[in-house]
Amino acid sequence: MLAKPRPLDHIGDADDGVAAKAAGLDALYGHLKPLEIIERSARELFHDEIAAVSSFGADSAVLLHMIAEIDRTLPVIFLDTGKHFEETLGYRDALVADFGLTNIQVIKPEEAALARIDPTGNLHQSNTDACCDVRKVEPLARGVAPFRAWFTGRKRFQASTRAALPVFEAVGARIRINPLAHWTTSDQADYMRAHALRENPLVAYGYLSIGCFPCTQPVQPGEDARSGRWAGHAKTECGIHLSGLEVSLTDASL
């Protein structure tokens, strides 16, 4: 049984801004179990103004299964970059069927932007940041625009850059929620096994973090899960989890 909720508006004065609200939420609810965080956020804090963002990658099944336990109609945003592995697209469809998710929102890059910025489809070979901007960051800004908050499946163990990841964090005027932030690899594996959740088939081939096929490769023993992303480049995040998304939201006046 969840404790009596504390209204979101009472967490930090209006002048404190969204960052203070996120910090307040993290202090109040960040210690809860992931399912409780999802339930509290979806049913009490943000109601119909919250979504989930999923890559349907290596670790996606757990968060989506938990969301389905709470509300199968909750919007799930999927960025169709045009560069996904076929296995990922098949996995997406399989999980949607497994969990009975009914509100998958597929967001794609704008055709005009691709024609202007990446007309040959080879931008990833010369400028990975620009490629991620047009195929991920800007589309996600459009996808989350109608919502006040969204869930992600990010975890601290995935990379050194995520070691201090909070459960609740501010992104411009919105709040991003990472219910699984404090989970370990064992927590992930135990949940997958306990609920007989299927894996992305690429995991069996050493892909422990899965993005677009041109910029993803198997992880070597001893490396962190995201070391196979943009290998050979000084890059560990696509931008949707960094300041790039906040800039895109601001630029779009959302």
UniProtKB/Swiss-Prot annotation:
The keyword Oxidoreductase applies. Its cofactor is [4Fe-4S] cluster. The active site is at 238 (nucleophile). One of its GO terms (molecular function) is 4 iron, 4 sulfur cluster binding. It comes from the Bacteria. Binds 1 [4Fe-4S] cluster per subunit. One of its GO terms (biological process) is sulfate assimilation, phosphoadenylyl sulfate reduction by phosphoadenylyl-sulfate reductase (thioredoxin). One of its GO terms (cellular component) is cytoplasm. It catalyses: [thioredoxin]-disulfide + sulfite + AMP + 2 H(+) = adenosine 5'-phosphosulfate + [thioredoxin]-dithiol. Keywords: Cytoplasm, Iron, Iron-sulfur, Metal-binding, Oxidoreductase. [4Fe-4S] cluster binds at residues 131-132, 212, 215. Pfam families: PAPS_reduct. It is an enzyme of class 1 (oxidoreductase). Disulfide bonds: none annotated. Its EC number is 1.8.4.10. Belongs to the PAPS reductase family. CysH subfamily. PANTHER family: PHOSPHOADENOSINE PHOSPHOSULFATE REDUCTASE (PTHR46509:SF1). Catalyzes the formation of sulfite from adenosine 5'-phosphosulfate (APS) using thioredoxin as an electron donor. This is Adenosine 5'-phosphosulfate reductase. It comes from Mesorhizobium japonicum (strain LMG 29417 / CECT 9101 / MAFF 303099).
